């Protein structure tokens, strides 16, 4: 299952500071307008990855229960499976959760290019349990057929603007923050 209790014993865990998705409303300096940003929604606080010979599973945990999957730009998972920036959108070869078949099935999209252009290449089960979300992917779908392998990953919630990497810095929440990725090495 996707619940945090089921994942508690799964190392390694990567963490993000909590409360960094807070809504912002502050007066501007002098005659400058107020700075208002209400895009904070799901506070991403931890992530884990596990794999076996057939699948690789990514899990993210939020500080509070995750909002409904019908929310716009909801809980994206971006994957770089080849470590080459030039072969994907900002290096990302796959994107999940931009589109869902239903609340329990995500559409797996591969970068098609140019720009922020994706095409469906498969579907995968989503496991949502309160503040925990997991997705299980066939390794063959991602081209991760041998051992060892490495995959860079990033969770993003509510960047608002599709195709703008800088939105990861200002809108919603990202794990890890900004333009960074985490790397999982499968042995």
Regions found by a protein language model. Name each.
Residues 128-176:
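Ser/Thr/Pro-rich, low-complexity mucin-like regions
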Residues 45-48, 121-126:
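Beta-strand-rich interaction surfaces with strong enrichment in secreted/lumenal proteins
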Residues 1-74, 78-116, 157-187:
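Order/disorder boundary and secretion-linked terminal/linker segments
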Residues 20, 80, 127, 137-138:
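Poly-acidic low-complexity segments
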């Amino acid at each position: 299952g996707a619940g945090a209790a089921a994942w508690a014993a799964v190392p390694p865990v990567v963490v993000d500071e909590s409360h960094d998705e807070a809504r912002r409303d502050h007066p501007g300096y002098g005659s400058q307008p107020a700075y208002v940003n209400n895009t904070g929604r799901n506070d991403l606080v931890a992530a884990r990855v596990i794999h076996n010979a057939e699948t690789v599973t990514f899990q993210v945990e939020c500080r509070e229960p995750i909002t409904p999957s019908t929310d716009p730009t909801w809980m994206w998972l971006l994957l770089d499976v080849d470590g080459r920036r030039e072969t994907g959108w900002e290096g990302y070869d796959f994107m999940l959760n931009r589109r869902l078949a239903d609340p329990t099935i995500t559409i797996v999209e591969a970068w098609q290019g140019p720009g922020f252009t994706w095409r469906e290449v498969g579907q995968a089960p989503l496991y949502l349990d309160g503040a925990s979300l997991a997705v299980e992917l066939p390794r063959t779908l991602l081209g991760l057929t041998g051992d060892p392998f490495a995959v860079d990953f990033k969770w993003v919630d509510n960047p608002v603007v599709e195709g703008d990497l800088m939105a990861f810095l200002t809108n919603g929440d990202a794990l890890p923050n900004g333009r960074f990725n985490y790397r999982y090495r499968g042995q």
